[in-house]
């Protein structure tokens, strides 16, 4: 029984479950998607909240530029570039047997400090917590030069506090590195699928890593328990945190500026499609919220998940969100896309974004590795498996038979003028030997 219903009843009510349970690559275009002006109200956060987060990151820029010299060139702003992918675009055009528009890569894989999209939300939340503590203690003023936080005295102050998080890898890396640098005692609770090199890197930064034999949800639960037992411990809640979400959302306006600088037009006649790898949902949900604020109905966001971990698709499609885990349906949550190995989605994100996300699709590990090798071969970009989940998105949109494009007014003419942006979530910090093994596996599939 699953939530009081036998499996057969679930399958009869939601025929799509047959595809998910069989681990087949699946696409579902959301019939409930609504105009941004209407659906943004579901989120419970506003453009003013995102502007507040953006201003906070600007206040911290002098600190980051000093504490992390790799951010000095960008003045302490943690941002990634966008890159056209002409060779991959040509390959996908062949596969689509028609015009697809322009293909771009968003290189969060190369974000400074922790080399993944989690450098956005994770670092932001810890900075916000540090600011709150320092302001309350009278050690910092909003108009001060925040570079003053990079001092022994401030590290000693933060050393009286703890930060904890549960993670499959990249969020833990971001939280651990920034927390330790500020002076916090940091603990990362890591699930069984976390890569060894991520654990090693955290320990090298003086972070306590607690390992679990079970999956992501257990690691998060243990982190939450640690924080509940200690009033001086801040738990970064990947499933429910509004601060994480806002840290990611800042990306929307920045991308608008980047595309404008690259002379890429985004409007109803030139739609923008953004393909976001999805684990628990905080990163893609926050980014999509920021994108909807920046571009309104001209942007179409899709979430991509591994066939073995389709937690958000399952939760939104059934409307039961975090009440369901993929394991309830015999789906094992085992994937090489470690950052996406999540069995139970964020209910906050699922509900907040369910009328703003155009579609959800799943990708097999084989396809992730195939695209990993192809992108390296054609464009010279080295990405981790999770980061490739967005690559087949354009083919899913052009190949759908659910009436989605017709419903959204996405005519062949508009599709030919579209921009497709694949959000590459991580990869630059993967050790060379591990990357070589990824590439070898992918090349066997070409």
From Swiss-Prot:
InterPro entries: D_Ser_am_lyase (IPR011780), Ser/Thr_Dehydratase (IPR050147), Ser/Thr_deHydtase_PyrdxlP-BS (IPR000634), TrpB-like_PALP (IPR001926), TrpB-like_PALP_sf (IPR036052)
EC number in record: 4.3.1.18
Cofactor(s) annotated in UniProt: pyridoxal 5'-phosphate
GO molecular function: D-serine ammonia-lyase activity; hydro-lyase activity; pyridoxal phosphate binding
Catalytic activity annotation: D-serine = pyruvate + NH4(+)
Xref: Pfam families: PALP (PF00291)
Modified residues (N6-(pyridoxal phosphate)lysine): 118
Lyase among keywords: yes
Keyword set, alphabetical order: Lyase, Pyridoxal phosphate
Record GO biological process: D-serine catabolic process; isoleucine biosynthetic process
HAMAP family: D_Ser_dehydrat
Family note: Belongs to the serine/threonine dehydratase family. DsdA subfamily.
Name of the featured protein: Probable D-serine dehydratase
